[in-house]
Amino acid sequence: MNSKNINNIILRDAKKTNDWLDKYFANKESPSINLINAMKYSVLNGGKRIRASLVLSAARLSGDEKSSLPVAAAIEMVHSYSLIHDDLPAMDNSDLRRGKKSLHVKYNEATAILAGDALQSEAFNILSNNKIIKNTYLQSELVSSLSRAIGHYGMAGGQMLDMEGEKKGFNFEQVKEMIELKTGALISASVVMGSIIGGGSKKIRNSLYKFSKNLGFAFQIADDILDVSSKSNIIGKPTGSDLTREKSNLINLVGLNKASKLANDLIKEAKDELIEFGSNGLELSSLADYIILRKV
């Protein structure tokens, strides 16, 4: 699959996800319209929707895409919540996200915290809603997968390690663990939850989990490379902050060239897990290539 085709798939998946989110929020009622507007500002504020595309692609590979859009939307809500909190002054103190003002700059810190909290809970509301996800057994699996991916043994734990690693000089294994939790856990959840809702067998899920573990690690390395090699007006967020804050990442630990080689090796290992699927695995394989070659 060439780069034009995979770009078209990502754009198509992003449009479907955005349309679903637009419709979901269109008539959303709340005691506070400001909170709803803040939530919409974040989750509908552009973005590549790579995680959504991973959900949808994994569902297609596993057999059935038709019920996967709500899962993709829930993942994007959680991702937006994580970005809101990452940008706060107490975390990464970033005033730019996706080329626009970060939520706490657009509104205020308190509203940003509450909007992030609300987006997280709304994601679980979607997954646990019998009118949206009609298979109660799958509901349980989806909720369990996402809750583990974003809690203390997932994204939140990884963010804590990221903060603890500033100016401490983590070794390779410590950086690897941080990445696997902070970034990799939600990437893995996107793929595995896509397979769950798509009806994938345990064998398929196991292969896709192995694929996603390597993919998540490579994804964060690619992000770190962009942080030192790109410009904020291109990627839509401040660059160079990891170096300024002496963060523990692969670039600071082993240098740009070795980190880039590791990322490419990880992508190859990830794609090897898809060989058994033949042509059905081409879409996820191309997504893996996109992740390592992207410029934003």
Residue ranges and their predicted role:
Residues M1-F25:
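N-terminal amphipathic/basic leader segments beginning at the initiator methionine
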Residues K15-K16, F25, E29-I275, S279-K295:
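Mg2+-dependent prenyl diphosphate-binding active-site environment of isoprenoid biosynthetic enzymes
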